[in-house]
Amino acid sequence: MKPKKPYETLDPENWDEMRALAHRMVDDAITYLETVRERPVWQPIPDVIAARFDAPAPHEPVGADAVYKEFSETILPYPMGNIHPRFWGWYMGSGTVLGALADFLASIMNPNLGGGNHVANLVEDQVINWIKEMLSFPKDSSGLLVGGGSMANFVGI
């Protein structure tokens, strides 16, 4: 058993290894998006893969490399299909490289708009002002950014 650290942390044990894994993930993700047209829009999940999701909870740590390998084998190959250009199921837009990178940067900052004097409040205000301008809404009208169509409908009600 490893000796307990004087404090708990979620930081990686080795930043260089984490950096290398992160670069590999970005490279793989860009290749995945770049080659989306070479794959079917959707494919069924093989029984052997589905069975891997009926496992007991892990009780020991698993390294980030192993988790990424599991993701690459069991999750990434079997999407809904909405990032494919021939997916015509409904309005959901496709994933984009810049959208994914923007999500990554937002996740790194982990902002919230619950209060405080930080830049996320200014970003939301700016985006709302741009939308008001595009829609010719009055400058003194208000707005709110939400996470998706369901929440927008809920707020609208």
PLM region descriptions:
Residues 2-140:
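N-terminal entrance/gating region of PLP-dependent enzymes' catalytic architecture
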Residues 124, 128, 141-157:
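Conserved beta-loop-alpha segment that forms the PLP phosphate-binding cup at the N-terminus of a helix
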